[in-house]
Amino acid sequence: MSKVTFKITLTSDPRLPYKVLSVPESTPFTAVLKFAAEEFKVPAATGAIITNDGIGINPAQTAGNVFLKHGSELRIIPRDRVGGGHQPRM
């Protein structure tokens, strides 16, 4: 079985630490997200993986599909940082 390798960078840390993960192509991407979140001590339930261009990745696919669509360099961010806008005051 072939493997795919991802370089996942933690964007919420100014030092931009990264992890390199190699997983079988058929691995559910939710498992990759969960493992990367645990490695960076970010809660998996509140983390999101995006491309270097800022495009969010739907984790409901295989690691092989993500690799083919988005390449190997990805970023993990806490979801409280997703969006870019601020909440208007009421």
From Swiss-Prot:
Cytoplasm among keywords: yes
Glycyl lysine isopeptide (Lys-Gly) (interchain with G-Cter in UFM1) crosslink residues: K69
Cellular component per GO, a single term: cytoplasm
Post-translational modification: UFM1 precursor is cleaved by UFSP1, promoting its maturation: processing of the C-terminal Ser-Cys dipeptide is required to expose its C-terminal conserved Gly residue.
Cross-link entry Glycyl lysine isopeptide (Gly-Lys) (interchain with K-? in acceptor proteins), positions: G83
Entry keyword annotation includes Ubl conjugation: yes
SUPFAM superfamilies given in the database record: Ubiquitin-like (SSF54236)
Keywords, ordered alphabetically: Cytoplasm, Isopeptide bond, Nucleus, Ubl conjugation, Ubl conjugation pathway
Residue ranges of the propeptide: 84-90
Source superkingdom: Eukaryota
InterPro entries cross-referenced by the UniProt entry: Ubiquitin-like_domsf, UFM1
Location in or out of the cell: Nucleus; Cytoplasm
GO biological process, one term: protein K69-linked ufmylation
Subunit structure: Interacts with uba5. Interacts with ufc1.
Function per UniProt: Ubiquitin-like modifier which can be covalently attached via an isopeptide bond to lysine residues of substrate proteins as a monomer or a lysine-linked polymer. The so-called ufmylation, requires the ufm1-activating E1 enzyme uba5, the ufm1-conjugating E2 enzyme ufc1, and the ufm1-ligase E3 enzyme ufl1. Ufmylation is involved in various processes, such as ribosome recycling, response to DNA damage, transcription or reticulophagy (also called ER-phagy) induced in response to endoplasmic reticulum stress.
Protein family: Belongs to the UFM1 family.
Name listed for the protein in its UniProt record: Ubiquitin-fold modifier 1
Organism: Danio rerio
